[in-house]
Amino acid sequence: MRLLAWLLPGLLLARALAPAQAPWPVRFVDVAARAGLTRPSVYGGLEKKRFIIETNGAGAAFFDADGDGWTDALVLNGTRLEEGARRELVWPKGDAPVSHFYRNNRDGTFRDVTAQAGFGKTGFASSVCVGDYDNDGALDLFVTYFGRNVLYRNLGGGRFEDVTAKAGLAAPRDRWGSGCSFVDYDRDGRLDLFVANYLAFDLAQAQEPGQGTNCLWKGVPVNCGPKGLPTDTNLLYRQRADGTFEDVSEASGVARVTGRYPMTAAAADLDGDGWTDIYVASDSTAAILYRNNHDGTFTDVALPSGVAYDEDGRAQAGMGLGLADFDGDGRLDLLKTHFADDIPALYRSLGRGQFEDVATSAGLGVLNRYVEWGAGMPDLDNDGRADVFYATGNVYPEIEKHFAQYPHRGPKVVFRNMDGARFEDVSARSGPGALAPHSSRGVAFGDYDNDGDVDALVMNMNEPPSLLRNEYAGGNGWLELKLAGTRSNRAGLGATVVVSVAGRRQARAVLSQTSYYSHDDLRLHFGLGANAKADQIEVRWPSGQVDVLKDVAGRRVVTIREGESGSTR
């Protein structure tokens, strides 16, 4: 008692002197049901997953399909295996799960127009990448599958046609497509296409849970892989002038990178040389950084660049990716998410294509019991600093019965960027939408309700998606930029935009794929803090052109056309 009396004044004094917890003005609310996003994404077994094809899940996309200035939504779907069998379930007519396309009604709600839009394929979908491959002003889609991938051409008004065979992209055999990105790697103004293949999987020959050394997790029998399963090679297709594609995987050097289990693929200029590179998160193996050699070929430089492994030199189970400038130096940094018992990687750009993993020193190492998936670095509170958001969900539904600390359904994890160097875990203060447990996979970020803050669309396994509306309560300004290429591809994919506000810089890239197997709205969102305008906007186009705009007023969407800024260098 005497000891308590002696300690109490000191404890009270320390508490009084401790800095007050800064208010966090971001609150996520899941409005999916009332917004009309109600169809579940069927993906493998519910209580147990026998094979790895049931576990990885799929992505989602925020994109303006009909050009009306409002973001539409696509949520990919999977299927199930027949009970006790090694084949996909044959569904009754009309019941087969398909990917769902929702048109934005411009009032906070969406309408399911899947059938009218032309989506009817059933199967284990993986990822989606978006780009205007024919430069007609309407955004097209490429969707990867366990089986055969599909190129959807936008016919206008958000109606799509399967043109895979017509475009020369019909595969000669089934493969397990994973990440993809449209990318103009040769600077001819036409989008080419990168496609990753996760691994070579033969359902007929696959081992049952627990049958091999790679079929146990912490002693519990689980589905096997990816370790121990044969790898595959990645693909690069070059677009010809007639709108068809040719396979240049071998000639470009892309197929020479082997022994990986590639997942999400993001295409951006990561070394600042004006040519688009491709970064690929890889499961249980070293990540890949395809450096563009400016001559139609690529070289994997992930190891010398510092983005192959974690800060201790270990391979990680790379799932999702986020690209943004978290430290405000005008260079693109990388966020990569991983498996349970690990933490995300945060690769800080040192310039000239060199990076260092600062995840631990930045404060991202405080959580490690979740499997991390869709990720991004959106500026959630519009203060001009890139925050961190990622979804979670275990791949083994049965593990929770043995280890409660590894939940099958997890929360969304939110870190606030404090000062460009350190992050604070604000998940518990980010509203019911962030805390609600789901086994989530892909996340797409965008301002679907056009209210000036970043919302999130989340693919949930065997549940409807979550539509997390950001009920931002602060007064910070913002600016959204939409690019329109002329010499470059029409959508501006691969461009880097650097916005300068009150002495601080923010860099973002226009990406075909990011997060986990997903696509963010192409309008780049920048927080302005207490400022009313951006002092300068610099656009580095994939053609090599650089446009500069001065004194751009905020709280609006601005379209920037290549070469029309009035200031070009």
Q: Where are each of the predicted segments found?
A:
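Gly/Ser/Thr/Pro-enriched helix-cap/hinge segments flanking short amphipathic alpha-helices
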Residues: 19-27, 35, 45, 362, ...
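Blade-edge beta-strand/turn elements of extracellular beta-propeller
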Residues: 28-30, 109-119, 159-170, 243-255, ...
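Repeat-based blade/solenoid architectures
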Residues: 37-59, 95, 117-129, 169-181, ...
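Beta-propeller blade termini
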Residues: 56-67, 103, 124-139, 153, ...
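Hydrophobic beta-strand segments that make up the repeating blades of beta-propeller
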Residues: 70-77, 136-145, 193-197, 273, ...
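Short, conserved, GDST-rich strand-edge loop motifs in beta-rich repeat architectures
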Residues: 76-94, 197-229, 390-407
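Beta-propeller blade signature
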Residues: 97-104, 233-240, 291, 348, ...
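Asp-box/WD-like beta-propeller blade repeats and closely related beta-sheet repeat scaffolds
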Residues: 113-133, 138, 144-185, 195-227, ...
